[in-house]
């Protein structure tokens, strides 16, 4: 819940001097990306901008405090300020910020700018007290914001110092409007106006000018002088001489003498107690100070000129001027030290009553009240956890004694989930083990079951499926039906374990159950995870179309719940890329992989390994070995600088081994084969993948017998576990083994099986990647004209892809090849005396490649009747009567030229 006062522009007071000269400068702010107002405290930055903002509608205001260094809090308030300015135009960003569904501030801002692209009016965003930001991530994100903000948006930043926002670059490009302390300092005329408004008896212009010069036009000093003069303690000029030459850091003594010592004791205590509040309203003041009518007291303090300012148009929220507020808080620690814990407790209770637990925690921590802090956490910690207030929760839990955690195991569980969210798996188990050792009877009942559900999640994340299964089953046995979150976790883990074991049907059912429960209870990240797992299972079963449809449901969920910035989004676009690649939709596959990299742009580069491997697969399928090599260099660097799940390593190894196969790099394959992991089992898709990598390397090295043993065992496992996509891949690799070993009939047998199975999987690129050897076999099958219709169509499609990307046979009949052919001593006399035209050679190459007449016409972009004429002419010149004879003739020519066909 956001505090309204932080999003309210300060109310323009009646007795302030209108800074006409500065407002004139600000009137052109819409021509700049950034308007920067900098000065020490008390120069009137906020007052000036509130005057400028008066009457503007398309403006958002965000007043910072120290707590805004938390990235999530900063994001929530900033987006809320934009929503205020645009009347709720950026709904997607608002939801993402509220639910913390973004990868980083920069990615959230990128989405914001997409939505703002449809907002065409001038727009202003004011951020006050930016000097309070010390988080470098926020500084970097705001630099991104300024670089990419729409042209119609102006950012207005108020700060006591020069912020780290790339100011120099903006200044050079004339995109910065600056107002500093010299310009903010009051002129003689403004000082005279100020005193005329504040004092009952006006002072002479010369006296006013001398006072202004004595304090260098410092607005706060002028306000203090007016206050002293009203209280008749000193003459205005005497106060001015005392203030001359001092600055904000040396005001304490003066404020004690001239302000605190000149109010009655009740007012003094009111000021000191209320100052602990960063913002205040009637209810807070009444509870913290004990005054019956808080609103009336605040208005009275405001009338006395005691540096109190309204924060909203309704007049409900107030705050002290930062300079005065800091002074009062320091004095409160001196004068009311004994009462201070009780004052903070009262503030915490009032914030809780108004529904602001995070503010209440701030005061409970300041009070050092562990019991109050514990009670707030017991009632609100999980809500704060679900809203990613992780830093605040971690600080709070550290402030509680261990005994308090033991008495409230829910808080131990919360601390463990915090560790899990930060991937501190070892610490999770250590914490839970210690708690179980020290908490009586914890090993039975619901809390133990919740511990086990979390432990199961940690175990599966850490690559220990057997332990994860044991713990998930225990949790599900002990958890009551109403404990939905832990039941979702345990069910999801059990489904993932079964996936790892190759029990795909049972795994799919559990993941569907997880999805149903997660949707019912709005646990959207587990709903998305379960859909991704379902898609992977369906892919492994060979049901790629159903996998596609499941992915569509996942994309719809992401759009509806604004989950675009979750790292899981990358997982989804990556498996979509794998599916597109299988279907030879390479451009779309590459775009999908690149979008996955974009999702992970704010994470460590190692997280991009899988998408990078997918990009390499696309290059390999296109036959673009130069690009593949360039990307492989980066992939191998990442492999050497990170720890990865076996699935990730298997996918990375796959593209490496295929590249070595295509380039004939036996040395690299042999070296890898000596050192690579050889899994004990092959009962899931990533273990099958690693063994397939091993078999491919063995085939490259001519170790046919070893490779055959591996592949036959893989096929046995794949058939028994119904890993149909893996079976399809295995058959293709077995085909290559038989072909290279000269076992042509075995090669044809398994190729026919692979083509038949591809009717279910839709595989194309898995055939294409095998290159020329695959092309030769498919030509022969097509020429035999014995393939069923579906297999015939797929074989022709695969040949087109091979020819398009690898330029196999088509390239052999280019002009250089024909010239060398005609000069060859063994060229048939018929060709020498009646040579084919260049177009007829192209047509012969396409006939040899398995193209039909219609496909040749499409390839060469001519009419089908023209192709028939070319074919008739080349048949006559070659002395052949039909297509199969032409193919055989082309094959003889290629063999004569030294091509292994």
Curated annotation (Swiss-Prot):
> Which HAMAP family does this one have?
HTH_type_MalT
Identify the residues that bind ATP.
Answer: 39-46
The task this protein performs is described as: Positively regulates the transcription of the maltose regulon whose gene products are responsible for uptake and catabolism of malto-oligosaccharides. Specifically binds to the promoter region of its target genes, recognizing a short DNA motif called the MalT box.
Family matches, as InterPro entries: P-loop_NTPase (IPR027417), Sig_transdc_resp-reg_C-effctor (IPR016032), TPR-like_helical_dom_sf (IPR011990), TPR_MalT (IPR041617), Tscrpt_reg_HTH_MalT (IPR023768), Tscrpt_reg_LuxR_C (IPR000792), WH-like_DNA-bd_sf (IPR036388)
- This chain's protein is named HTH-type transcriptional regulator MalT
- Which Pfam families would you find in this protein's record? GerE, TPR_MalT
This protein's gene is called malT
Key word Protein transport present:
no
- Domain (HTH luxR-type) ranges: 829-894
């Amino acid at each position: 819940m956001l505090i309204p006062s932080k999003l309210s522009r300060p109310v323009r007071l009646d007795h302030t001097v209108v800074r006409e000269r500065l407002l004139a400068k600000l009137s052109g702010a819409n021509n700049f990306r950034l308007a920067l107002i900098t000065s020490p405290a008390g120069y009137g930055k906020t007052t000036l901008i509130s005057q400028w903002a008066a009457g503007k509608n398309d403006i958002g205001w965000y007043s910072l405090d120290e707590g805004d260094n938390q990235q999530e809090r900063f994001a929530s308030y900033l987006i809320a300020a934009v929503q205020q300015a645009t009347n709720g135009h950026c709904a997607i960003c608002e939801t993402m910020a509220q639910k913390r569904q973004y990868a980083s501030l920069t990615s959230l801002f990128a989405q914001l700018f997409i939505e703002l692209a449809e907002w065409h009016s001038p727009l202003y965003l004011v951020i006050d007290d930016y000097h309070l930001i010390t988080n470098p991530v926020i500084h970097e994100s705001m630099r991104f914001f300024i670089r990419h903000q729409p042209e119609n948006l102006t950012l207005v930043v108020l700060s006591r110092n020069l912020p780290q926002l790339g100011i120099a670059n903006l200044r050079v490009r004339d995109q910065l409007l600056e107002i500093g302390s010299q310009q903010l300092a009051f002129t003689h005329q403004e000082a005279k106006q100020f005193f005329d408004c504040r004092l009952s008896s006006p002072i002479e212009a010369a006296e006013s000018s001398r006072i202004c010069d004595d304090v260098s036009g410092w607005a706060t000093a002028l306000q203090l002088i007016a206050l002293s003069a009203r209280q008749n303690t000193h003459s205005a000029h005497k106060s001015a001489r005392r203030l001359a030459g001092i600055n904000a850091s040396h005001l304490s003594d003066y404020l004690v003498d001239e302000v605190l010592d000149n109010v009655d004791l009740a007012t003094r205590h009111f000021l000191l107690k209320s100052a602990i509040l960063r913002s205040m309203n009637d209810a807070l003041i009444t509870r913290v100070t004990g005054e019956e009518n808080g609103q009336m007291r605040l208005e009275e303090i405001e009338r006395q000129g005691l540096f109190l300012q309204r924060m909203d148009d309704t007049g409900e929220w107030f705050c002290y001027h930062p300079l005065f507020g800091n002074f009062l808080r320091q004095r409160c620690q001196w004068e009311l030290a004994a009462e201070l814990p009780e004052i903070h407790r009262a503030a915490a209770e009032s914030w809780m009553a108004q529904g602001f637990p995070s503010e209440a925690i701030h005061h409970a921590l300041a009070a050092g009240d562990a019991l109050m802090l514990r009670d707030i956490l017991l009632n609100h910690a999980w809500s704060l956890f679900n809203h990613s207030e992780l830093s605040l929760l971690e600080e709070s839990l550290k402030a509680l004694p261990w005994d308090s955690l033991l008495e409230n195991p829910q808080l131990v569980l919360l601390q463990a989930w915090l560790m899990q969210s930060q991937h501190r798996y070892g610490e999770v188990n250590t914490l839970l083990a210690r708690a179980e050792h020290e908490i009586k009877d914890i090993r039975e009942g619901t809390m133990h079951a919740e511990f086990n559900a979390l432990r199961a999640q940690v175990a599966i994340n850490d690559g220990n499926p057997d332990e994860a299964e044991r713990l998930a089953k225990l949790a599900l046995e002990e958890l009551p039906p109403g404990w939905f979150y832990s039941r979702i976790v345990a069910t999801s883990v059990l489904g993932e374990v079964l996936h790892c074991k190759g029990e795909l049907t049972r795994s799919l059912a559990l993941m569907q159950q997880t999805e149903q429960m997660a949707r019912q209870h709005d646990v959207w990240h587990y709903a998305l995870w379960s859909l991704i797992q379902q898609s992977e299972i369906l892919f492994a079963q060979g049901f790629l179309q159903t996998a596609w449809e499941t992915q569509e449901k996942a994309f719809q969920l992401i759009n509806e719940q604004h989950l675009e910035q979750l790292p899981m989004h990358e997982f989804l676009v990556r498996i979509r890329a794998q599916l597109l690649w299988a279907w030879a939709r390479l451009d779309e596959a590459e775009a999908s992989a690149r979008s996955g990299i974009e999702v992970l742009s704010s994470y460590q580069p190692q997280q991009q390994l899988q998408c990078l491997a997918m990009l390499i697969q696309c290059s390999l399928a296109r036959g673009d070995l130069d690009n593949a090599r360039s990307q492989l260099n980066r992939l191998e660097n990442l492999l050497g600088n990170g720890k990865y799940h076996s699935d990730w390593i298997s996918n990375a190894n796959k593209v490496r081994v295929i590249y070595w196969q295509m380039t004939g790099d036996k040395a690299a394959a042999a070296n890898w084969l000596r050192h690579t992991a050889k899994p004990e089992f092959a009962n899931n898709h990533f273990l099958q993948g690693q063994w397939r990598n091993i078999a491919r390397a063995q085939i490259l090295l001519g170790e046919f017998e070893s490779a055959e043993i591996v592949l036959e065992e893989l096929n046995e496992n794949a058939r028994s576990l119904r890993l149909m996509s893996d079976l399809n891949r295995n058959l293709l690799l077995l085909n290559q083994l038989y072909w290279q070993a000269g076992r042509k009939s075995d090669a044809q047998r398994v190729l026919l099986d692979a083509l038949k199975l591809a009717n279910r999987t839709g595989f194309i690129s898995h055939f294409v990647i095998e290159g020329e050897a695959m092309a030769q076999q498919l030509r022969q099958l097509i020429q035999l004209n014995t393939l069923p219709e579906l297999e015939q169509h797929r074989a022709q499609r695969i040949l087109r892809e091979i020819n398009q990307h690898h330029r196999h046979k088509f390239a052999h009949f280019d002009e250089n090849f024909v010239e060398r052919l005609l000069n060859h001593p063994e060229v048939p006399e018929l060709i020498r005396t009646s040579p084919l035209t260049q177009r007829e050679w192209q047509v012969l190459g396409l006939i040899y490649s398995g193209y039909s007449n219609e496909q040749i016409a499409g390839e060469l972009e001519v009419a089908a009747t023209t192709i028939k004429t070319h074919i008739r002419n080349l048949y006559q010149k070659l002395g052949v009567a039909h297509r199969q004879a032409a193919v055989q003739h082309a094959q003889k020519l290629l063999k004569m030229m030294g091509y292994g066909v």
